[in-house]
Amino acid sequence: MTTVTSLDQASGRDVARVLTDSFLDAPGWLDVGPERARHRWVVMWGYHRALHRKALQWGCPGYAAVRGNRLVGVAVTFDWEAWPPPEPNSTLLDAPSFVLAGPWAAVRGARADATMKRAHFHEPHLYLWQLAVEPRAQRSGVGRLLLERVIADADDAGTPIYLETAKPDNVPYYRGFGFTETGREKLPRGAPLWLMLRPHS
């Protein structure tokens, strides 16, 4: 049985594990991250620890899916007025991971971040920053449970949901929940980034 609870009930280490294992070979991270998988995993784990801290401090923060005693999925959300997190705090939290990534990956990461901020939806919305399920729990309904909670929050607030995805398979998945493509960008090494919006019910 899978239980969905607030993200603030999950440990930072577990959140970082789920996000990193889920996205290790995802197109977005292959585009911007270090080449070697082990190096990329270490960088991503540190980045996702910082992401969890940002979510707790400035985010909604989102939801955690637990199966047994194990965290198997996370959804990280922000109100539109809270995104992006304030500077220099946000960059200082990211700095150790950028240093560890090396100069070229750090530059790619900064360029990708700038692209996402430039293209970000600028009207009131709920931002779904991350939706991740650990690999062995994927295609078992965990993502659906998390996304349904996020959709309920947005509908209660009367706001649309905005997200980005660099994974082609995610585009039809999100369409199944009422999202439509509103634009498309390119990451530094050419991977496409889809921008999607779900109107509130």
Regions found by a protein language model. Give the residues of each.
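Conserved acetyl-CoA-binding loop-helix of GNAT-fold acetyltransferases
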Residues: 133, 139-152
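Conserved beta-strand-loop-alpha-helix junction that forms the acyl-donor binding cleft
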Residues: 129-138, 162-171, 188-189, 199-200
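Conserved GNAT acetyl-CoA-binding A-motif
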Residues: 124-126, 154-166
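Active-site rim helix/loop that mediates acceptor-substrate recognition in acyltransferases
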Residues: 36-61
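Conserved active-site alpha-helix within GNAT-family acetyltransferase domains
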Residues: 144, 156-157, 167-184, 188-189
